[in-house]
């Protein structure tokens, strides 16, 4: 069941300036730390888990329908939802493997973890973050600027 909740302009601005900004900012920051390389195994694992959680939250924000009242979704900010959905890259192509790997190796404690070979445990951070950055840029382009907090523009990919 999908809910099409109407959210006030004030709430959207406040939310984007605090929580949405934070999730994307953290994802970008953790990504940069991971790509620089981390010696300490505990720190690496903590950063990787943070990356997976923040990436999941952002991917859900862009792709999942609103299931529960209060779920924040990109479509709340988009005046032309049809054109947004058409422009959004394929979830299956870019994130289906990420979703499966996330479930199997990070967010579910499962005996299936025993089936993961050592060479399969590596995460291709660049392959995951690249389409997310493009989608964030697309969102900033397609969202109604009157519904976004101005600091959201800081998250645009620098070219």
Name what the model sees in each region:
Residues 1-49, 67-159:
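Acidic, Ser/Thr/Gly/Pro-rich intrinsically disordered interaction regions
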Residues 61-67:
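Juxtamembrane helix-break-helix junctions at the cytosolic face
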């Amino acid at each position: 069941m999908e809910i099409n909740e109407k959210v006030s302009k004030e709430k959207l601005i406040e939310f984007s300036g605090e929580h949405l900004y934070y999730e994307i900012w953290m994802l970008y920051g953790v990504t940069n730390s991971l790509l620089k390389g981390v010696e300490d195994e505990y720190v690496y694992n903590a950063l990787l888990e943070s990356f997976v959680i923040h990436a999941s939250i952002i991917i859900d924000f862009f792709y999942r329908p609103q299931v529960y009242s209060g779920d924040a979704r990109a479509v709340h900010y988009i005046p032309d939802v049809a054109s947004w959905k058409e422009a959004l890259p394929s979830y299956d192509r870019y994130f289906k493997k990420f979703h499966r790997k996330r479930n199997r190796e990070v967010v579910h404690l499962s005996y299936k973890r025993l089936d993961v070979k050592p060479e399969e445990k590596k995460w291709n951070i660049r392959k995951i973050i690249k389409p997310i950055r493009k989608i964030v840029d697309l969102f900033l382009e397609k969202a109604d600027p009157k519904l976004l907090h101005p600091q959201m523009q800081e998250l645009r990919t620098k070219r």
